[in-house]
A protein has these predicted regions:
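Solvent-exposed, non-membrane alpha-helical residues enriched in polar/charged side chains
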Residues: 35-36, 105, 230, 272
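Membrane-anchoring hydrophobic segments
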Residues: 14-18
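TM-adjacent membrane-interface loops and short helices in multi-pass inner/ER membrane proteins
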Residues: 196, 205-208, 212-264, 271-285
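Extracytoplasmic catalytic-loop and juxtamembrane helix elements of membrane-embedded
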Residues: 70-85, 192-213, 217
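Transmembrane beta-barrel architecture of outer-membrane proteins
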Residues: 99, 269-270
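Juxtamembrane loop-helix boundary motifs flanking transmembrane segments in multi-pass membrane proteins
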Residues: 40, 74-78, 157-161, 221, ...
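Alpha-helical transmembrane segments of multi-pass inner-membrane proteins
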Residues: 2-9, 20-33, 43-78, 84-192, ...
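Cytoplasmic juxtamembrane interface segments
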Residues: 21-41, 207-225
Length: 304
C-alpha cells in the first residue's frame, strides 16, 4: 500500500493513481477491521456465515429471475445483462464464487438448517455460474473443490478418530457431489432453453463450448493483452507507470495496432498488471503477500 502511494510520484495520471490507491486503502482497512472484529467476537464467524447465506439467496434469486426477465433463455447473448447489481456478469460470477468457501465451512461446522440450506446454496450457485457462463468462474469453482479435497484428505490423515474420519469424509464428498450436480444440471438447463427457445443455430454457452474455447485459445484476446502488457513492462521494468495507470500506459502499444482506439482497461492478470504499474519492486512486494499468507496457512494447518 505504501509503495503504491509512492508510485503516484511518477504516475502518468496522478489523479487516476490517487483514485485507485484510495480503493486499495479501503480494502486494506476493511481487511484489518474484519480480522480484528473476528478475533474479538466469538460469534463473528457465525454472523458472517448468516450474512453470506442471506446475500447468496438474494444473488441466486436475482440471477434466475432475471434470466427470464431479460429473455436470456431466448437470446444467450442477453446474459450480459445478468449483473446482479454488481456492474457486470463477470464481477457477479466472482461475487458468487467468493461466497462458496463460507458455505463449505457452514456445511462442515454447522448442523441442521444452516448445513442443509448451505448445501442447497452450493448447488444453486454452481447452477447460476453456468447461466452466467464465465470461463474464469468455471476454473475457479474446480480449483476450490480441488483445494477442499486436498484439505479433506490432509485432515483425514491427521485425524486418528475413525468416527470423525467417516463423518467428515462423507461431508467433503457430499459438497463436491452437490457442486458438480449444480454444474451438470445448469448445463442441461442451458441446452434445454437453447433447443426450445433460441433462434440461433450454435450454442456457445454450454460447458463443452466454453471449455473448448479455453482449450483452443479463444482467449486470444487475453493472450494479446498479456503480450502487449509485457511490451510496456519492458519499457519501464524497474518503476512501472504508477498505480492505476496500466490502462494509460498500454495505449501507446494497443492504439498502434487497433483502428477503433478501444484499449483494454486491465491486463486480466493481476501479476502482470502489478508489474506494469509498480515495476519489479512492486511485483516482488505483491508476490510476497501471497507467500506470507500461504506459509501462515500451512503453519496453521499443521498446528492443529
Amino acid at each position: 500500500i505504501v509503495y503504491m502511494g509512492v508510485s503516484i510520484v511518477w504516475a502518468i495520471n496522478c489523479v487516476e493513481g490517487f483514485s485507485i490507491w484510495n480503493r486499495w486503502i479501503l480494502i486494506f482497512i476493511a481487511m484489518i477491521l474484519s480480522i480484528g472484529f473476528m478475533l474479538k467476537d466469538n460469534h463473528a464467524i457465525k454472523n458472517l456465515i448468516i450474512c453470506t447465506i442471506v446475500i447468496a439467496t438474494i444473488n441466486v434469486l436475482s440471477c434466475i429471475i432475471c434470466y427470464y426477465v431479460f429473455d436470456v433463455h431466448i437470446s444467450q447473448r442477453n446474459n450480459l445483462k445478468l449483473n446482479g447489481f454488481y456492474g457486470n456478469k463477470n464481477i457477479f460470477a466472482v461475487a458468487l464464487l467468493f461466497k462458496l468457501p463460507f458455505l463449505y465451512y457452514a456445511v462442515l461446522r454447522f448442523k441442521k438448517f444452516i448445513r442443509y440450506y448451505s448445501l442447497f446454496l452450493i448447488f444453486a450457485i454452481s447452477f447460476c455460474l453456468i447461466i452466467l457462463s464465465t470461463r474464469s468462474s468455471f476454473i475457479g469453482l474446480f480449483l476450490q473443490l480441488a483445494v477442499l479435497c486436498f484439505y479433506g484428505v490432509f485432515y483425514q490423515i491427521k485425524s486418528r478418530k475413525l468416527s470423525l474420519i467417516f463423518k467428515h469424509s462423507r461431508l467433503y464428498l457430499l459438497i463436491c457431489l452437490v457442486a458438480v450436480s449444480g454444474f451438470v444440471l445448469g448445463d442441461a438447463f442451458i441446452k434445454y432453453n437453447f433447443a426450445h427457445y433460441s433462434k440461433i443455430e450454435t450454442n456457445n454457452y454450454s460447458i463443452g463450448a466454453r471449455v473448448t474455447s479455453i482449450a483452443e485459445g479463444n482467449s486470444k484476446g487475453r493472450l494479446l493483452i498479456w503480450k502487449n502488457t509485457c511490451e510496456i513492462i519492458k519499457q519501464s521494468p524497474l518503476l512501472g507507470y504508477g498505480v492505476g495507470n496500466h490502462k494509460l500506459a498500454i495505449m501507446k502499444v494497443e492504439c498502434a495496432k487497433k483502428h477503433d482506439y478501444i484499449v483494454s482497461d486491465h491486463a486480466h492478470n493481476d501479476f502482470l498488471e502489478m508489474f506494469s504499474e509498480l515495476g519489479i519492486f512492486g511485483l516482488l512486494n505483491y508476490v510476497s503477500t501471497y507467500l506470507v499468507f500461504g506459509i501462515m496457512a500451512l503453519k496453521q494447518m499443521f498446528r492443529y
